[in-house]
Amino acid sequence: MSNNANVAAAIKEVAHKVFGGYAELLRMPHTARFSIGSVIACMPFPMVGMTITISVQHYYGNYSLAGVLTAIQAIALAVSSPLLGKLVDKFGQRQVSIPTILVWIVAAIALTTSITNRAPVWVLYCLTPFLAAIPPWGAMSRARWTTMLKGDRERTDRALSLSGVFDECMWIIGNPLASTLAVISGLLAFSFTGVCVVIGALMFLTELTTEPKSQTQLAREAGLTREEYREREAAKAQRMRERDAA
């Protein structure tokens, strides 16, 4: 019995050392909601490509078409992600995310309907790029952590590490889940992904207390133009780097 108790105590101690810091962060007010919400809303990243591949092959019997459409969505995502990130910095998280989500939902419904009805291939080519209209949930979550924990470098690093863990979990779960659902039904896979987007977005975007101000808001409060504000912040960051290097 004593050996079992010692083993249990050792396991508990190790678990506390590994996960205790993460649990402390998630116990902070409002943090669990936006952190978990961002992971749920990110499900299109691992799921859409796999869903397109399996669904198109099923309805069109063409792996080449499936591969091309998946590549189009991936390229569009690579182009749109940094652009959306810049828009979020400029205008704010909710102001950019809400219209972006609406575009994604409409595109997902249109593409699902087109695939299941075996629409002409050119229709799929036109609709697929719009599935890259995904807000940068991970970056927005990290921005919230950084704002909340400003000045506390240790906990900020831990929070960013936690965000990375959540991202990895999303990919580990999303790909096999998309494969399973798409084999059953492409409509089911797209529907599940859409539900994740809506639930995750509601959890994240309705948490207003942790939303950082946009550059436009901060510049207005400082009585500066956005360009002047960015230059001032860049100069501050440069001074901090020089101080840390000294």
Q: What residues fall within each predicted segment?
A:
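Symmetry-related core transmembrane helices of the 12-TM Major Facilitator Superfamily/SLC fold
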Residues: F190-T206
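Helix-loop boundary and gating motifs at the non-cytosolic
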Residues: E13-A78, Q238, A245
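Cytoplasmic helix-loop-helix junction between adjacent transmembrane helices
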Residues: F130-C169
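Helix-to-loop junctions at the C-terminal end of transmembrane segments
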Residues: S80-Q93, A182
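C-terminal ends and interior cores of transmembrane alpha-helices
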Residues: L102-R118
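Transmembrane alpha-helix termini and helix-breaking/packing motifs in multi-pass membrane transporters
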Residues: I173-T193
